[in-house]
Amino acid sequence: MSVFLLMLILAVILFLYQSLTLYQPPLTQFISMNEKQSFEPFVEIDSKLSCYRPMLDAETISTTQPLKLLVWNVHKGEDKGWQSLLLNYEEKTDFMLLQEATSLQKLPQLLQRMPNQLFASGFSYRDMQSGVATLSLFSPQYYCSAAVDEPWLGIPKTGVSSVYPLDNGKFLLIINVHMINFEWTPTAYRQQLEQIMQQLEQRVDAVIIAGDFNAWNQERVEILQQKMEQFGLHEISFFPDNRLRFNDFPLDHIFVKGLKAISATTQKTKASDHNPMWVELAFD
């Protein structure tokens, strides 16, 4: 390799890293298009989580009506057609849990029936923030975010949790997560999963944990299944099942507690490298 080529490669790497900003803890924002709701920070569990509660009371969710959920890794909006797909689901969905969402997608403006967005970003590249986004009609009672760094890349993988009051006096916890990917021995993977499950120690009655779990080998699948079973969650099965697979293992999952599936489907699409999951749930 010539000295010139080596210097060129180093210059490109330096440029990329100078354009990259890492957020640890995650940069977390609540954006509402309908109301001027503000949140104040507080410590709910431990210092590993950044938590916020609203200045105003949140509206309750009905437990007599089905809860409809879309979960999708949107691949940073790099593929044609993602806007149309989200708009097609908007009318029949109460919550959208998106991974690899970005600030440039302007999701609250696009999805006017989903005016409330929680966005937890692990990094920004050239002023484009990227992370997980939870969109809904409902404002949370409180929310938390956390991240664990990818071992090889050092880029934080984020998760955001939100708690909603139910009309029966109980609470619903929703966790939207994008799990560690680039690691052969799943040390950081376990750490991130422990961080997620820690939140189930709080007083919640119904739980949804969903997202891109990057469970691409048998060891990761077993770690994931054991931890979910430990906390009483069960996995949703899909028909048809068109989830993205690696080594024949699906990467995307939905786990629930205190709810049961009425229907659960996936859709083939070219609007992302992942296919969306949609589920209709009833409270137990």
PLM regions: where:
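Active-site beta-strand/loop signature of hydrolases that rely on acidic residues for catalysis
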Residues: 67-74, 84-108, 173-177, 196-221, ...
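Soluble catalytic domains of enzymes that build or remodel membrane lipids, polysaccharides, and related
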Residues: 78, 105, 126-128, 132-204, ...
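Metal-dependent phosphoester-hydrolase catalytic domains
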Residues: 2-55, 200-207, 215-284
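Short, glycine/charged-enriched secondary-structure capping and boundary segments
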Residues: 83-86, 110-113, 189-190, 222-226, ...
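Boundary/entry segment of secreted carbohydrate-active catalytic domains
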Residues: 37-81
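A generic local structural motif
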Residues: 56-57, 81-85, 119, 160, ...
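Structured beta-strand-rich core segments of catalytic domains in phosphoester-bond hydrolases
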Residues: 33-56, 95, 99-171, 267-268
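Active-site-proximal beta-strand/loop segments in catalytic clefts of secreted hydrolases
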Residues: 72-75, 99-101, 120-123, 136-138, ...
